[in-house]
Amino acid sequence: MDYILAPSILSADFKVLGEQMKLTEDNGAKYLHFDVMDGMFVPSISFGMPVLKSIHNATDQVMDAHLMVQEPIRYVEAFKEAGADIVTIHLEASEVVNATIAKIRACGLNVGLSICPA
C-alpha cells in the first residue's frame, strides 16, 4: 500500500518556514497541506491565499488547500491563482456542494471532500 504524507504548514514555525518545507520534502512528503480557517465555519483563523501564493514556487510539492470556510465556492478561483493543486472542502460548509466540486474541477484542480464525523 502506498501512503501519501501531507504535512500541514499550520504547525510550522514561520520564521523558518522555507527550511521546514525543505525538510518535509527531503523526508519524502510529496504534498503540503494548508489548513485554511475563516473563524466562522471553525472557530480559529489561519492563513489564506497570500501565504500559499508566496511559497508555491519554492517547492515541487503538491499544494492541498483544505478550506475550512463557509461557502468555499467563493474562494476556488483565488486558491487556483495562488497555486493550489487540490482544493478540499467540507460537505457541511456549503449549500451547493455539487456546484463547488464542479467549479474546482472546471478550474483544473483535484477535489478533496471532508466529512465532519460529529
Outline where the language-model segments fall.
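A structural motif
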Residues: 26-31, 60, 84
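Glycine-rich, proline-tolerant flexible connector loops at the mouths of alpha/beta enzymes
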Residues: 32-49
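Hydrophobic faces of well-ordered beta-strands that scaffold small-molecule active sites
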Residues: 3-8, 32-34, 63-67, 87-89, ...
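Conserved anion-binding
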Residues: 13-16, 58, 74-75, 84-118
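Short, charge-patterned binding micro-sites
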Residues: 40-42, 68-71, 82
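N-terminal amphipathic alpha-helix/helix-capping segment at the start of soluble metabolic enzymes
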Residues: 1-11, 18-19
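Conserved, mostly hydrophobic/aromatic
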Residues: 17, 24, 35, 79
